[in-house]
Amino acid sequence: MIKAIKGFNDILPAQSAKWLYLESILANVLGRYGYEHIRLPIVEQTDLFARAIGGATDIVEKEMYSFTDKSDPPTPLTLRPEGTAGAVRAVNEHNLLRGDTPKLWYIGPMFRYERPQKGRYRQFHQIGVESFGSALPDADAELIAMTHLMWQELGLKDEMRLELNSLGEIDERHAYREALVTYLTDKQEQLDEDSKRRLTTNPLRILDSKEASTQALLVDAPKLADFLGEESVAHFEQVQAYLTELGINFEINPHLVRGLDYYNKTVFEWVTDKLGSQATVCAGGRYDGLVGQLKSADNRDGKGDNKPVKSEPAVGFAMGLERLLLLMEVVAPIADMPACDVFVVAHPEVYSAGISYAQNLRYSRPDLRVKMASATSLKAQMKKADKSGAALTVIIAQQELDDKTISIKDMQTGEQKTAAQDWLLDKDNFSRHK
C-alpha cells in the first residue's frame, strides 16, 4: 500500500473541521484590522530564499526541498520553507507599494526537511501577516496587539507569554557579532558542536542554543543591547510603551534573535509552557531592508529597471497552525463538529420526494448541514443516519406524502414525532448553531 510521505500528514474530515474553525477566527481578527488576503505560490525560485533568508541559515543550508525544473536552461526551484520572502517578491513584482502601504495575510503549507516530531512536520501550515510601508514602532505594536486579540478569541490568552528583543540596525548587529565572536573564540572548545559550527557561519544563533553548557558561557558574553544606537533604543522603548498602554505584558529576552537573517530592530515570540520543547507558537519582527535587498538583487541580475533602490520598511509574523491546534487541544479543546445536522431518510418508492425535500431545506436553511443516503432500504438508510452525527432524522414515506407531513426522530433521545412539512423551515423550531 502506498502511504503518505514521512512528515507529510493527511488532515482527515474530523480534524479538518477544527482547522476550518481555527482559520475562521484568525481570518476574522485579521479582517477587523483591515488586512487583505493574498494567495502565493508554494514553489519559488531557490535563489529567492537564499537571498532573503540568508545562505548561512539552517533553512537554506540543510532544510529546503529543492529541485531543478525542465525548462531550458533549467531553473532551480524550492518548495517554500516560509512565506515572507514570497510575499515580498509579490509586492515588488506587482508594484503594490506604489502610493500604498499594503497590509497582507496568507495561509498555507510550508516545507522543511526536519526530523518529524509532535508539532513539527516536514509539511506544516502557517498563517503569515506582513505590514509594509511604516518604519514607526506603532506598526510593530499593532501586529503584537493583533496576535494578543487572537489568543483572547481562541481562549488562549492566559497560556501565552510574549518575549521581545531588538536586533538593532545591520551595522550595530555587525559590531556586536564581532564582539561575540571574539568572546566565544577563546571558549569554543566548551561550546556544543552545533554552536561551534555557527561560530563561523551565523554566530548570533548561538544565543538561542538549547544547550545548558552553552547558555552558561553566554552569561558573561557581550550584550546586544549595549551595541544599539539611539534610534534603535528609542524605537524599542516606544514599542514597549505602546504595549504597556494596551495592557499587554511582555518580557525582554536578550537571547531572542530569530533564525532568519532579514530581521532588524524589533523581534518577538509568543511562547507557551504547555507544549514541551515546541514552545514557540508565533514569531515575527521587523525587516526593513528585505524589500530593497530583493530589488537590488534583481538589478544585479538584469531583471530590474536599474534605478537606485530605496527599501521600504516592513514588519510581520507567522504562526504554526499545527502547534496552535495542539495547544488548543490541551487548554481549550474544540468540540467535535458533526458533518451533519439533519439526515433525510426516504422510502425507496418515494425517494425522489425525499431528494426534493432535502434540496428545499438546503435552500431555505443555509445554516443547516443536510445529508441523505443512497436509495437503499429504510433500514440501511437509518444505519447511515445513526452514524452521521445528525441531531434530527427526517423520515418520509408514502403516508407522510399523503398527509403533507414529515416524521422527525430526535437522534439523542430516540423520540419520534409527526410535524408539518415546513416545520424545519422555522428556525424557532430547530437550530443547532445558536
From Swiss-Prot:
- Report which reactions are catalysed by this protein: tRNA(His) + L-histidine + ATP = L-histidyl-tRNA(His) + AMP + diphosphate + H(+)
Q: Name one GO biological process term.
A: histidyl-tRNA aminoacylation
Among the GO molecular function terms of this UniProt record, one is: histidine-tRNA ligase activity
Query: Where is the protein found, in the record's own terms?
Result: Cytoplasm
Q: Which InterPro entries match?
A: aa-tRNA-synth_II, aa-tRNA-synth_II/BPL/LPL, Anticodon-bd, Anticodon-bd_dom_sf, His-tRNA-ligase, HisRS-like_core, HisRS/HisZ
Keywords for this protein? Aminoacyl-tRNA synthetase, ATP-binding, Cytoplasm, Ligase, Nucleotide-binding, Protein biosynthesis
Instruction: State its Enzyme Commission number(s).
Output: 6.1.1.21
Q: Which family does it belong to?
A: Belongs to the class-II aminoacyl-tRNA synthetase family.
Spell out the subunit comment: Homodimer.
From the Swiss-Prot or TrEMBL record, give the protein name: Histidine--tRNA ligase
**Annotated organism of origin:** Psychrobacter cryohalolentis (strain ATCC BAA-1226 / DSM 17306 / VKM B-2378 / K5)
